[in-house]
Amino acid sequence: MKIEVLFPEVCNLYGDLANIRYLKKSFKDLEIIETKLTDEPYFLKHKPALIYMGTMTEHNQELVIEKLSKYKKRIKELIDQNVHFLITGNAFEIFGKEIICEDKRVIKCLDFYDTTAKRDMMHRFNSLYVGKFEDINIVGFKSQFTHSYTKKKLNPLFETVRSCGLNPDTMDEGIRINNFMATYVIGPLLILNPPFTKWLAKEIGIKDTTLAFEEAALDSYNYRYNEYMQKKNIYY
């Protein structure tokens, strides 16, 4: 079973690559394919069990958009074929419509969903996060210079319980299209949320979903959830 990690040399802020290290630590038979910006993506001719991409700098967003724009048709095919994608942090914006910079410059993105990200590089948004995925509680963080906006009703990945969603005016966080899942929430997401990680492992075909250090991970997850839900804790 193969997982493709897109551009780990640049999409590695906030420890996001630990998501993949944790999967590999938990499931020894996984093969991790790291695709660099100069490589032909593995997904171009194959169907990985999971495609992952994490957070990057604003400059590198433009490099990644330029690279992936060549493969929009293939990415659309994979989404339609229910291949699993997990996209975290500001990588969410890559697959949206556009990014508007402070100088009004517009960066066109891949346009798989109708979101406009608005940058404010003088004000970083930091927040604790609690949300809901089906019947699973989600905990994590947000740390970003952007919020995303849309005039359309999207299918959110998470329903926010505490913090905000894609922007301060909505509780809808992220997006889910078939098995394509993208969210601003970081953590690393899979380490902080073992129930979600076990769900994802089962989804991609892993039979024994026992995680590395599962007992400790669950203890930390439950402690963090209870702590984040206390009203005395300020979110942002």
What are these regions (language model features)?
Residues M1, E134-I138, I175-M181:
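Beta-strand-turn-beta hairpins that frame and shape the catalytic cleft
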Residues M1-E77, I191-P194, K198-Y236:
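N-terminal beta1-alpha1 cap of cysteine-dependent amidohydrolase-like domains
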Residues E34, L86-G89, K142, Y184:
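A structural signal for short, well-ordered beta-strand segments and their strand-loop junctions
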Residues L50-G54, L86, A182-Y184:
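Structural motif
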Residues M56-F133:
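Cysteine-nucleophile active-site neighborhood
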Residues E58-H59, F92-I94, H147-Y149, L189-I191:
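Glycine-rich nucleotide phosphate-binding loop and flanking beta-alpha elements
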Residues E102-E173:
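Pocket-forming structural segment of enzyme catalytic cores
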Residues N167-E203:
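A glycine-centered loop/beta-turn motif at secondary-structure junctions
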